[in-house]
UniProtKB/Swiss-Prot annotation:
This is S-adenosylmethionine:tRNA ribosyltransferase-isomerase. InterPro entries: QueA, QueA_dom1, QueA_dom2, QueA_sf. Its EC number is 2.4.99.17. It comes from Heliobacterium modesticaldum (strain ATCC 51547 / Ice1). The lineage of its organism: Bacteria, Bacillati, Bacillota, Clostridia, Eubacteriales. It catalyses: 7-aminomethyl-7-carbaguanosine(34) in tRNA + S-adenosyl-L-methionine = epoxyqueuosine(34) in tRNA + adenine + L-methionine + 2 H(+). Monomer. It comes from the Bacteria. The keyword Mitochondrion does not apply. Disulfide bonds: none annotated.
Length: 344
């Protein structure tokens, strides 16, 4: 299947540069999979759109200030490092720039010398494995010297005092290099209103890394390889999902990361989501048969991206691209700080 089938024209002005305030004032396109019908709402209307008994599943991951800047030791070369995955023993898988100058054995001094990164090896995905050298607590140090890893299409840095705007209000466990952006639209009040209406909410964990945002650089979808990301389904979530499925209630994934987590877990246990953790490199594109989710809340995604392919697998490529065209005509805002879709 050609990657070009998932391309579309996107004017630069449609890319949201700042988030809407309040969070739940963003727009919400509702797409009905069976008929292709589209409705235009506000995100806080979700409380009136979902049914009592629906189960919302959110991703409780928390973004770390994973973007670090420094100098290649004994030179004036500026280096950017983005933390991806901890590997133990102070080693991390990272992205680096400029890559060609950072070979094994090279040191990079970060945070005015408070942290040193030793390049250990080059990875299959063009990143690096580094070993960090430092004093004190690593997480505290990263919080002090790191920056939020906003996507490159967001051209204005988020002030440190506004860093929470790139976190979901229910984020708990540190580990992501990007936000699970579908969840950015929820407020504490909206979550409370949903619960009062009889809509159940549970959480799983997927630490967002290269697998979620790595561009597709091949011509055929089948040739793209996903990067592994850590996921976890705890017993409470597994029980809630199993009960909903047994009772014929809808399971609605808040974001593609939740969809990939639940479909991974279901694939390991003959269609049943069981408690457990591990690494997933699941790549969902048209032709995939969903085993768990009945609905999906998601943002509007980049052309030719694996996220757009996942959404197309769930709702149909032509139907999704038609909805995207309508969204552009009606002035919806795209990507991480943009508006949302509910696909049911």
């Amino acid at each position: 299947m050609e990657v070009a089938l998932y391309d579309y024209e996107l004017p630069k002005e449609a890319i949201a540069q700042t988030p809407v305030e309040p969070r739940d004032a963003s727009r919400l396109m509702v797409l009905e999979r069976r008929t292709g019908a589209v409705d235009h709402r506000i995100f806080r209307d979700l409380v009136h759109i979902l049914h009592p008994g629906d189960l919302l599943v959110v991703n409780r991951t928390r973004v770390i200030p994973a973007r670090l800047f420094g100098k290649k030791r004994d030179s004036d070369v500026t280096v950017e490092i983005v933390l991806l995955t901890p590997m133990g023993d102070d080693r991390w898988e990272v992205l680096v720039r400029p890559g060609r100058r950072l070979k094994p054995g090279v040191f990079v001094d970060l945070g005015e010398g408070r942290l040193a990164a030793e390049i250990v090896e080059t990875t299959d995905f063009g990143g690096r494995v580094v070993r960090f050298h430092y004093s004190g607590d690593f997480d505290t140090l990263i919080d002090e010297i790191g920056q939020m890893p906003l996507p490159p299409y967001i051209e204005t840095a988020l002030p440190r005092q506004e860093a929470e705007r790139y976190q979901t209000v229910y984020s708990q466990e540190r580990g992501s290099a990007a936000a699970p952006t579908a969840g950015l639209h929820f407020t504490p009040q909206l979550l409370e209103d949903l619960k009062k209406r009889g809509i159940e909410i549970t959480s799983v964990l997927l630490h967002v890394g290269l697998g979620t945002f790595r561009p597709v650089q091949v011509d055929r979808i089948e040739e793209h390889k996903m990067h592994s990301e850590f996921f976890q389904v705890d017993p409470e979530a597994a029980r809630a999902i199993a009960k909903a499925k047994q009772e014929g209630r809808r399971v609605i994934a808040v974001g593609t990361t939740v969809a990939r987590t639940l479909e991974t877990a279901a694939g390991l246990h003959n269609g049943t989501v069981a408690a457990g953790s591990g690494w997933t490199d699941i790549f969902i594109y048209p032709g995939y048969t969903f085993q768990c989710i009945d609905g999906l809340i998601t943002n509007f995604h980049l052309p030719r991206s694996t996220l757009l392919m996942l959404v197309s697998a769930f709702a149909g490529r032509e139907q999704v691209l038609a909805a995207y065209r309508e969204a552009l005509e009606k002035g919806y805002r795209f990507f991480s700080f943009g508006d949302a879709m509910l696909i049911i």
